[in-house]
């Protein structure tokens, strides 16, 4: 919550940023500050756990538990005040996801899920869509905007889905996209080059 408040306050100001190699791969000082704050809190409560964070790198304490942190998923949106960005944190036990939290900051919506414990939005249970026909669904996607090969691959898939469904959206924050699948407001999420499998398939996705 403290990191989310830091990001919320920063979103109201003019933001300086730099690119991490490619023109559309941005990082802000707020990314770094939020990452430091989250990492500090985890270390205070779980000093023996491994931590992998987008801006600060990783440690390796040989723990069965590993925390994955993206302090601002959707940094480009954050820079442009486009209201789709979130704090995303996951916990893995022996390589398997057991807890996930995604905080949709512009909409003040906190998603939470735990293995065997269900999925929630602001303490209300959520579930995936009940639709049984692919062509009745709305879908979301993401792709790395600075890799031409993967853009081309994604565009072909997007074209096929778009022609056979209610459409495809790309909002620029994959963690929120997958939460929207979990909430049932879209039917599936597609992306090439996901580094870690962090979502279960919906009724309609392969």
What are these regions (language model features)?
Residues 1-72:
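N-terminal subdomain of lithium-sensitive/metallo-dependent phosphomonoesterases centered on the IMPase/IPPase/PAP
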Residues 127-199, 203:
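An extended, acidic
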């Amino acid at each position: 919550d403290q990191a989310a408040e830091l990001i919320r306050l920063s979103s109201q100001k003019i933001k300086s940023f730099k690119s991490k190699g490619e023109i559309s791969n941005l990082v802000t000082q707020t990314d770094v500050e939020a990452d430091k704050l989250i990492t500090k809190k985890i270390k205070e409560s779980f000093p023996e756990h491994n931590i992998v964070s987008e801006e600060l790198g990783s440690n390796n304490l040989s723990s069965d538990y590993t925390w994955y942190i993206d302090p601002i998923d959707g940094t480009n949106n954050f820079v442009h005040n486009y209201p789709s960005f979130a704090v995303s944190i996951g916990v893995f036990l022996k390589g398997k996801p057991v807890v996930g939290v995604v905080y949709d900051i512009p909409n003040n919506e906190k998603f939470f899920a735990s293995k065997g414990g269900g999925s929630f939005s602001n303490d209300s249970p959520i579930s995936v869509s009940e639709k049984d026909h692919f062509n009745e669904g709305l879908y979301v996607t993401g792709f790395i905007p600075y890799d031409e090969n993967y853009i081309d691959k994604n565009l072909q898939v997007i074209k096929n889905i778009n022609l056979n469904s209610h459409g495809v959206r790309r909002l620029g924050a994959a963690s929120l996209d997958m939460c929207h699948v979990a909430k049932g407001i879209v039917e599936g999420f597609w992306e090439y080059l996901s580094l870690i499998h962090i979502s279960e398939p919906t009724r309609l996705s392969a």
